[in-house]
């Protein structure tokens, strides 16, 4: 932030985003020139929000929040900025520098597929006063009373994965790739050295079932599915080893202490 003293930092972020869009389009161009069959995608941190009530104000808030997610893929899939994003720039007085050549490149080389991460869902409301909040992948939101929570307060919502798949595929009509899905939890090593993580098995089973339904019942074109992650590693959202995702346990604590021995869960 110190480098941009005197500037609107949010505007700086959107300017950087524009450069990323152009770079992505150029990368797609190069990949297709080298191999016409090569597929290049974009990546979304897929936050799924539900309106907390059926009040129009809450539904509008949910729509606005989802636009904050979709503005990236709307641009990279369609090859041009959505009108709502350009209107936001205008309303806020942002002057995002972009050339005609930039816009031509973006239009000519959109992505071929959409990859995304999905861990949980949450609710949003126009007025959050008095409502219980819940943690999430990148931000806090309103707790959904119909969904259980993980050890870190993330809402466990397998059906939300199906909803995400359907929303994305209906919006873009391009193949999807689920590249992150998993449960961060506290694992206990038993006296015999075993680690029983039935809760993680249940989480993955139910999410895979909903993923399958999106294919068989909703017609979603899904390229693939990968979990986060095959082995315990430092959780980016909390900087903790104790927030474990893997199928393989690593003997190390939040402070780097341990043997680093690996064990099958």
Sequence positions of predicted segments:
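Active-site region of glycoside hydrolase catalytic domains
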Residues: 1-265
């Amino acid at each position: 932030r110190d480098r941009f003293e005197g500037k609107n930092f949010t505007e700086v972020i959107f300017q950087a985003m524009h450069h990323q869009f152009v770079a992505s389009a150029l990368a797609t161009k190069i990949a297709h020139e080298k191999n016409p069959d090569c597929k290049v995608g974009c990546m979304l941190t897929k936050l799924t929000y539900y309106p907390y009530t059926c009040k129009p104000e809450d539904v509008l808030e949910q729509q606005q929040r989802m636009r904050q997610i979709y503005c990236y893929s709307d641009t990279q899939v369609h090859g041009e900025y959505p009108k709502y994003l350009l209107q936001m720039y205008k309303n806020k007085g942002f002057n995002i520098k972009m050339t005609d050549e930039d816009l031509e490149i973006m239009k000519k080389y959109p992505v071929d597929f959409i990859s995304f991460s999905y861990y949980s869902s949450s609710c949003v409301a126009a007025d959050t006063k008095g409502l219980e909040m819940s943690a999430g992948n990148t931000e806090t939101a309103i707790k959904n009373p119909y969904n259980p929570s993980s050890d870190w307060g993330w809402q466990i919502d397998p059906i939300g994965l199906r909803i995400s798949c359907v929303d994305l595929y209906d919006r873009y009509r391009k193949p999807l790739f689920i590249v992150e899905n998993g449960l961060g939890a506290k694992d206990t090593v038993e006296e015999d050295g075993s680690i029983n993580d039935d809760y993680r098995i249940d989480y993955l089973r139910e999410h895979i079932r909903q993923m399958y339904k999106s294919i068989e019942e909703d017609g979603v074109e899904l390229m693939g599915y990968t979990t986060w992650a095959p082995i315990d590693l430092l959780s980016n959202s909390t900087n903790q080893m104790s927030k474990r995702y893997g199928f393989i346990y690593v003997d190390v604590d939040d402070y780097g202490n341990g043997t680093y021995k690996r064990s099958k869960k």
